[in-house]
């Protein structure tokens, strides 16, 4: 019985898994609900289900250097073990490595000395859980303040360095339903507008410079029928315009007037959205990428249909939901500027090139069961001040290296022969042998050649269908074949390259099979003529039957001549230009 085929998502993740590793991994004993990265400094906020907020600082350069040095040492030890036969193959996968070469913090509340990461301060900021926390994005106070909200229905503004609360606002009195709660916080990038989305689909707007007054500045009622999943500012359009996601629709709202447009029902939950990196850099708010609960990312354009419906979709992981999406923010790299990061419920990170419409890189945030589920689902993504990706679930947080993939490209020749593919070595035991690798590679090359229509004409290898067409054309011109001149018989082998000689041999091999079929048809006609002659004797029929094969054999020899076929090809009589260089 054949082996059960693995899911496409698993195979794709293993094939596209990047060699980039984290520089630090922080584990949280209590569920992690929200994170935020400082826009200009290596400062990290983390809000927990207990209502605590931690403000941490990390030395990114030292962490990068430490993980790179340790990885090189482990790589050398692994190569030595492979040469001595202690291990079957060299592992190139980051997620399947038994040893971690990056810094691992087992408890975020108890960080050991010398870890190159410290907690600046921690506090019990909210009585319930901390739902959302963000840094101040205004240009004149960039990153100086933080805003947080919890299930206690209080928004608090605090200083980033000290953690001291500067002002707060109680928002429960502005709910349309007393059982409502805040799900999301977003601040305008140009105006003191602090937006909060609720579980009932409302958007409440406060003045971040005057929160102590507890006055509601704007209110958009029922932007969606269900909980607000995401709010995205549109600074290129107006400081009053925002995009919101809720349930199965996308809405374009003006916080002064209400809903401008609302999309068609997508029949799938819309979870997160972002602008592409080039649109963020060029201050454009036209192309929007939206993540779905069914494992896809859709592309929307305001200029095409006013965001009424999706234009195209990219399949990411049909086995999981895409819970978070964020632009790379790196406009210095041509590949990165067209890409966005997204995290799914299976603990995988995917980099999508939205212009190519496919996943181009995969990283594994969590491959094992977590404390709060089968896997640590990637529910939060952020980008730090130096374009490093930050991924987080409820159990752990990882800051990924921003170095390019260089380690896997520096492979030794001695190792590449025995371990060409980590995937093959993990899937079966036979893939450790060189013979099986060669056989698999040859099989793959044959399959690729079968599916590439131009491969034969470029390499000079003809398939059986082309041979049949050439011979059929030569049979239709039977008189020309029989009148082959002596000069054509005397073509020297030096006039043709070795590749063309291989073509001739293949055609000679197929010519008798085709010519036999034509001879069989002629033989039937001759037998019918012979049966009509009743006066002939059996003794006279026998030599005729013996003479016919002799004549037919001569015709076979004439048809086996490849010079006619070569001449026809050189004159392009078949429309195939294969010997233009001769």
Curated annotation (Swiss-Prot):
UniProt lists the family membership as follows:
Belongs to the WD repeat WDR55 family.
Originating species: Debaryomyces hansenii (strain ATCC 36239 / CBS 767 / BCRC 21394 / JCM 1990 / NBRC 0083 / IGC 2968) (Yeast)
> Does Nucleus count among this protein's keywords?
yes
Query: Any one Gene Ontology biological process term?
Result: ribosomal large subunit biogenesis
In terms of one coarse class, where is the protein primarily found?
nucleus
Report the transmembrane regions from the record. Answer: none
* Keywords for the protein's UniProt record, in alphabetical order: Nucleus, Repeat, WD repeat
Which intervals carry biased composition (Acidic residues)? 410-438, 447-485
Note down the stretches annotated as region Disordered.
405-496, 531-582
Write out the GO cellular component annotations: nucleolus
* Record's compositionally biased regions (Basic and acidic residues): 531-540, 570-582
The gene it comes from is JIP5
Q: Where in the cell is it found?
A: Nucleus, Nucleolus
Q: Output this protein's name.
A: WD repeat-containing protein JIP5
Q: Give residue ranges of the WD repeats.
A: 27-68, 125-168, 177-216, 265-310, 373-410
């Amino acid at each position: 019985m054949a082996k059960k085929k693995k899911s496409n998502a698993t195979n794709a993740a293993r094939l596209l898994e990047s060699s980039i590793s984290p520089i630090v991994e922080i584990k949280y004993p209590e569920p992690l609900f929200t994170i935020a990265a400082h826009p200009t400094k290596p400062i990290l906020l983390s809000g927990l289900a207990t209502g605590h907020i931690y403000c941490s600082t990390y030395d990114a350069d030292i962490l990068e250097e430490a993980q790179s040095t340790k990885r090189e040492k482990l790589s050398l030890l692994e190569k030595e073990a492979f040469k001595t036969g202690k291990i079957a193959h060299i592992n190139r996968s980051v997620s399947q490595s038994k040893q971690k070469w990056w810094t691992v913090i087992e408890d975020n509340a108890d960080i050991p000395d010398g870890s190159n990461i410290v907690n600046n301060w921690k506090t019990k900021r909210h009585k319930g859980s901390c739902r959302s926390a963000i840094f101040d994005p205004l240009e004149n106070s960039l990153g100086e303040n933080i805003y947080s909200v919890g299930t206690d229905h209080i928004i608090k503004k605090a200083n980033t360095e000290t953690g001291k609360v500067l002002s707060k606002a109680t928002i429960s009195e502005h709910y349309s339903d007393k059982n409502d709660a805040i799900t999301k916080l977003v601040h305008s990038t140009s105006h003191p507008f602090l937006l909060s989305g609720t579980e009932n689909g409302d958007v409440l707007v406060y003045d971040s410079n005057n929160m102590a007054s507890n006055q509601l500045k704007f209110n958009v009622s029922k932007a969606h029928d269900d909980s607000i999943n995401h709010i995205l500012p549109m600074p290129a359009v107006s400081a009053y315009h925002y995009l919101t996601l809720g349930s199965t629709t996308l809405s374009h709202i003006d916080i002064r007037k209400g809903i401008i447009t609302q999309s068609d029902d997508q029949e799938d939950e819309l979870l997160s959205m972002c602008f592409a990196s080039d649109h963020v850099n060029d201050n454009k708010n036209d192309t929007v990428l939206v993540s779905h609960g069914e494992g896809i990312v859709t592309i929307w354009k305001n200029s095409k249909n006013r965001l009424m419906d999706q234009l195209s979709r990219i399949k990411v992981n049909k086995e999981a939901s895409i819970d978070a999406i964020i632009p790379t923010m790196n406009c210095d790299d041509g590949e990165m500027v067209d890409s966005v990061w997204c995290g799914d419920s299976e603990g995988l990170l995917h980099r999508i090139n939205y212009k190519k419409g496919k996943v181009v890189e995969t990283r594994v945030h969590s491959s094992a069961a977590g404390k709060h589920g089968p896997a640590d689902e990637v529910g939060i993504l952020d980008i730090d001040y130096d374009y490093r990706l930050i991924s987080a679930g409820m159990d752990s947080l990882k800051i990924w290296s921003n170095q390019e993939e260089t380690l896997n490209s520096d492979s030794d020749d001695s190792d590449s022969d025995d371990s060409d593919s980590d995937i093959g070595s993990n899937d079966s035991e036979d893939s450790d042998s060189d013979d099986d690798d060669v056989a698999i590679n040859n099989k793959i090359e044959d399959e690729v050649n079968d599916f590439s229509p131009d491969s034969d004409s470029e390499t000079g290898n003809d398939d059986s269908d082309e041979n049949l067409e050439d011979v059929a054309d030569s049979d239709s011109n039977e008189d020309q074949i029989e009148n082959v001149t002596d000069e054509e018989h005397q073509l020297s082998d030096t006039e043709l390259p070795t590749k063309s000689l291989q073509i001739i041999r293949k055609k000679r091999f197929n010519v008798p099979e085709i010519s036999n079929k034509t001879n069989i048809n002629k033989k039937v006609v001759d037998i019918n003529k012979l049966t009509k002659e009743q006066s002939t004797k059996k003794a006279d029929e026998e030599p005729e039957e013996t003479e016919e094969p002799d004549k037919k054999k001569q015709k076979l020899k004439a048809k086996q001549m490849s010079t006619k076929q070569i001449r026809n090809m050189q004159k392009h009589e078949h429309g195939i230009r294969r010997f233009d260089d001769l």
